Design a protein with these regions (language model features):
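N-terminal secretory targeting modules
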Residues: 1-95
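Alpha-helical cap/lid subdomain in secreted, periplasmic
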Residues: 136-177
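Short acidic-hydrophobic sequence patches enriched in Asp/Glu that either
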Residues: 14, 112, 116, 171
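Surface-exposed, flexible loop/turn segments at secondary-structure boundaries
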Residues: 28-30, 104, 136, 163
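Serine-esterase "nucleophile elbow" of acetyl-processing enzymes
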Residues: 53, 60-133, 137, 141-149
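A generic structural signal for short coil/turn motifs at secondary-structure boundaries
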Residues: 8-9, 105-108, 163-167
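Short loop/turn segments at strand-loop or loop-helix junctions that form parts
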Residues: 2, 100, 157-160
Length: 177
């Protein structure tokens, strides 16, 4: 079930605004897109994203809707199978943190897995924290202080579309410090 009955936008399809993407890791370790679940109403949507698996263990990743909230999600499996969380890896890679605009958030992406932050996370095999704020990626020092508390491998700041040149000139030195 979704939090809003607004499933799409004039400039963005249901598959991105309200859909879910399923990816499976292939035998070579690459993430492969399997399916997109597109709702046709706010609640009681049912779809099969994959069937006929070979009985082996598979690693899966689900991307949630870019703009609509999920209030309930159930995942069904064939009788005799189950879903297990991955064990916590104490040597896990630190995340890439993206801070930016609606573009960073995923505006106009056709599907949740097609946002550039998600693509980079899969290709680099790293967790991603997406802090894209529609119209509000403005390099504020208060937000920078909070983001600096994150233990990240790298920070990617992509706020330029929300700022004018004088603001960039004033805020970048403070941000870097």
């Amino acid at each position: 079930s979704l939090s809003s009955d607004r499933l799409n936008m004039p400039h963005m399809p249901t598959s991105g605004v309200s859909g879910v993407d399923l990816y499976l890791r292939d035998p070579q370790g690459r993430w492969r897109w399997v399916a997109n679940g597109r709702p046709n109403r706010q609640s009681d949507n049912t779809t099969t994203l994959i069937s006929g698996l070979d009985g082996r263990e598979h690693e899966a990743m689900v991307y949630f809707p870019l703009y609509n909230g999920v209030t309930q999600l159930s995942i069904g499996t064939m009788q005799g199978t189950d879903i297990q969380p991955l064990p916590r890896d104490e040597t896990a890679k630190k995340p890439i943190v993206f801070w930016g605009t609606s573009i960073t958030h995923g505006a106009c992406a056709s599907r949740p897995g097609m946002v550039h932050t998600a693509i980079l996370g899969r290709r680099l095999n790293r967790p991603v924290i997406n802090l894209g704020f529609s119209g509000n990626g403005r390099m504020e020092s208060e937000v920078a202080e909070l983001i600096a508390e994150l233990d990240a491998e790298v920070f990617v700041v992509d706020c330029l579309p929300n700022l004018k040149a004088p603001e960039v000139k004033d805020r970048v030195p403070v941000l870097v410090e």
